[in-house]
Regions:
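Adenine nucleotide-associated cytosolic modules
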Residues: 2-383
Length: 383
């Protein structure tokens, strides 16, 4: 039994959870959840929150939470009351420390050998004879350690990872950030990611080498050809030659987009994320726009134009001025943050960048400025 007092919201959550669980549930502790013996008591949780139980039997029950045995099997094996097992499962599930469902990642357009195990411990449709499956099992584990902690996720994050395969993402740009972001998204499971350069004939140069996947031997090669050739190596999942099953694209503009692109994204209701060109020793990520729902890029522009006398003139000068590359450390930082927010949006439908911007100062990257915008009355994005 827990040693701390139950709050009302936990009691209600526990009652709802028990209704969804039964004796055939196969509980598994989420990745990173700690079970620590404290004398006769047992602590379950992590460094920032957890719960402590009295009695040695709880520890024996927890040791069986591996996802391979049902609650009834655990109770029979330990010769304990089934209600004790299901009550423990319900409470830990309400605290989001357990996975209680099984899902499988089915790779798009892949042959499966007869008799292959439908679900492995990693959540993959397993095939011991397929080297691709074995490689993916190793690469997917770190990704699942993130997705399993998402809200209402009870299958280890497997279904979220599986859905990423069919989500098309278009990255517009050819800067360090754009190229790094392309590699990160492919390696994170977004196999339908495409990098679209505004210079189709651009060659890889010295400045493109920034600790990413481009090498010294790539200098002088066509950027488009190299990006296309490296794609199968970067992608977590095999590429689906049949194309995406998800019709809703997501666009990312690294640098200023053309008016034609902006109009297309808004008119076709394509969610889009902005990553501005660097300005002096700072750079802005956002907003992430859902057309017709959240404030658009023009809303943010009109708001800032109201606040700063020369804002419009400054923006025009920035568009015609020579572009400058970001420092290597900043490029990796920005690409990583943008990728995390985009993945969170794809997985959950939510993001801190919806209608908001994140301005990073190179000299104090931790002390970034987060700002939320409202729909501007002079903008017609909601008319």
């Amino acid at each position: 039994m827990p040693t701390h007092e139950h709050t009302q919201w936990r009691t209600l959550a526990l009652m709802e959870t028990r209704l969804a669980l039964d004796a055939e549930t196969k509980p598994q502790l989420k990745t990173g959840t700690l079970v620590i013996a404290r004398g006769e008591n047992t602590y379950v949780g992590r460094s920032d929150y957890g719960i402590e139980y009295e009695g040695a039997q709880v520890r024996s029950i927890l040791a069986c939470f591996s996802g391979t045995r049902t609650c009834s099997e655990i109770a029979h094996e330990l010769a304990c009351d089934l209600d004790n097992v299901t009550s423990l499962v319900a409470e830990l599930d309400a605290l989001h420390f357990l996975d209680t469902q099984k899902s499988a990642i089915v790779l798009s357009d892949r042959y499966r050998a007869p008799g292959a195990d439908p679900i492995s411990d990693s959540g993959l449709c397993d095939d011991n004879l397929d080297a691709t499956f074995q490689q993916i099992k190793s690469r997917i584990r770190p990704e699942l350690s993130l997705t399993t902690w998402g809200p209402e996720v009870r299958d280890g994050g497997v279904s979220l990872m599986s859905a990423r395969q069919d989500q098309p993402v278009l990255i517009y740009g050819n800067s360090r950030i754009a190229i790094l972001l392309y590699g990160i998204l492919l390696s994170s499971g977004l196999s339908q990611t495409t990098l679209i350069s505004d210079e189709p004939s651009r060659l890889i140069g010295d400045i493109d080498l920034c600790g990413g996947f481009l090498r010294l031997s790539d200098i002088g090669s066509s950027q488009n050809e190299r990006i296309t050739n490296i794609r199968p190596e970067l992608s977590l999942f095999p590429l689906n030659c049949a194309g995406s099953k998800n019709p809703r694209e997501i666009a990312i503009s690294v640098g200023p987009p053309t008016p034609e692109l902006l109009q297309m994204w808004m008119s076709e209701c394509i969610p889009h994320l902005f990553i501005e060109d660097p300005e002096c020793a700072s750079i802005t990520i956002g907003p992430l726009v859902i057309p017709g729902t959240t404030p658009c890029w023009r809303c943010t522009a009109l708001t800032q134009d109201d606040e700063h006398i020369a804002w419009t003139e400054v923006q025009w000068q920035r568009r015609i001025a020579p572009r400058h590359e970001t420092p290597v450390s900043v490029a990796h930082h920005v690409a990583g943050l943008a990728a995390l927010e985009l993945l969170h949006f794809i997985d959950t439908g939510n993001s801190d960048l919806l209608g908001s911007t994140f301005r990073i100062n190179y000299l104090s990257a931790i002390d970034a400025k987060y700002r939320t915008f409202l729909h501007h009355p002079a903008c017609g994005c909601r008319w």
